[in-house]
Amino acid sequence: DTGHQTYVHKLLTGRNSEFDGLRQPGEISGYPSRAESSHDWIENSHASTVLAYAHGLATADATRGGSRRVVAVIGDGSMTGGMAFEGLNNLGHSGLKVTIVLNDNGRSYAPTVGRLSESLIRIRSNPTYMRRQRRLEDIAESLPWVGELLERSISATKAALRDMFEPTAFFEALGVHYLGPFDGHDIAEIEDALRNAAEFDGPVVVHLLTQTVRGHVPAE
C-alpha cells in the first residue's frame, strides 16, 4: 500500500543501477509501474488501495483454477481508510486466500481516527506485553525437560491474551482471521507467522509491531 514506499521493492527487483534517475523524466517512476517491471503487479500512489488490488488478484487466480496465496502489505494508517474497510469486507465475504501483513508503526501523515486505530494504539503503547512474551519464551528454551510442555502452555496463553484485544474481534467479525501481534523486527518470528497464515484457507491478518527506521539512531 502507498506506492511511494516502493523504493526497497525496486532495489530488490533489479532497478538499483537506475536509482540515480528516480522520478526524473524518462527514468524510473517513484511508484509501482507495470510498464516498468514485471515485478510491479499493481500501480498505486496513496493510501488504502492495496486490499482492493489483493481481492482482484486473488479473484483472477481463483477464476483460472489457481491456488496461489496473495500477500498484501498495509500500514496501520492506511488500514483505517474507507477503501481498506471495503477491501476487508470483500475479502472476508469471498473467503479468498489472502495474507494481509499489517505493518503497525504508528506513523501516518495525519492523525488516524476510529475504533480500530484506538485499539492498535493501545497494543502498540503497551511494550510490557511484548517483553513478557519474549521472557517466557526464553525461560521455556532454557528448561530442557519441561521446555516443550511449557512452550505449549505459553502458546495457549499468548493466544488467549491476543483474543482479549479488540483487533481480533474486529477482523474476525468480517470473516478475516487475525494472528498477532508479533515483533516486526524478529525475522524468525515473522517467518513462522507467515507459514502459519498460509495454513488458513481464507484471508488472514498478520499483525506486526514495528518502529520506523529502527537501528538508525538519528532518525529514531
Summary of predicted features, one role per range:
Residues 105-220:
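Long, well-ordered, tryptophan-enriched scaffold segments
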Residues 92-98, 108:
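Extended low-complexity acidic/polar segments
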Residues 89-90, 103-105:
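Asparagine-centered polar/low-complexity signal
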Residues 69, 97, 203:
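Broad gene-expression machinery/nucleic-acid interaction feature
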Residues 1, 98-103:
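Short internal beta-strands
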Residues 56, 72-73, 100-102, 206-208:
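Structural beta-sheet core signal
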Residues 1-94:
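Cofactor-binding active-site loop characterized by glycine-rich and histidine/acidic residues
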